[in-house]
């Protein structure tokens, strides 16, 4: 077995060989970014005990819901869910972190590293370049007000 981390492509042939040799319940993990990816892996490896979604869920926080409901969320519905999740994470960090505004700002900017990569680059750049919570919150407001 090798250690690939986040580089390269998933080696599905190696995974299949491992699955065939493995006597234990097996969980698939690797490059699941859409409902289609989930279905493809389920078809290709029907004996799986489960899947770990990871960064795909960070990029699209509604991925599990879309899978469960077998439909893509509408833009406004996605925005509402993302805004709710952001508010929850922001408030939890604000409550628990003891390093002040700068620590909260850095944590929240990290939150956006994988989140919504298909979003408007200008708006994401404004979030990442914000130097104060005031500027961050302005950038977030602009992000959630986009059409």
Q: How would you describe each model-predicted region?
A:
Residues 1-8:
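Short, small-residue-enriched loops and turns at beta-alpha junctions
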Residues 6, 13-28, 32-147:
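Alpha/beta catalytic cores of nucleotide-metabolism and tRNA/nucleoside-modifying enzymes
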């Amino acid at each position: 077995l090798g250690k690939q981390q986040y580089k390269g492509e998933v080696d599905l042939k190696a995974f299949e060989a491992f699955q065939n040799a493995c006597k234990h319940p097996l969980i698939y993990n690797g490059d699941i970014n859409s409902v289609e990816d989930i279905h493809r892996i389920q078809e290709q490896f029907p004996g799986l005990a489960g899947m770990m979604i990871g960064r795909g869920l960070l990029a699209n926080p509604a991925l599990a819901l879309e899978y469960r409901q077998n439909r893509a969320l509408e833009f406004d519905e996605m925005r509402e869910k993302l805004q709710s999740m952001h508010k929850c994470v922001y408030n939890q960090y604000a409550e628990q972190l003891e390093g002040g505004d700068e620590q909260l700002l850095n944590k929240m900017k990290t939150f956006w590293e994988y989140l919504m990569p298909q979003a408007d680059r200008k708006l994401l750049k404004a979030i990442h370049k914000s130097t104060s919570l005031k500027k961050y919150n302005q950038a977030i407001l602009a992000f959630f007000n986009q059409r």
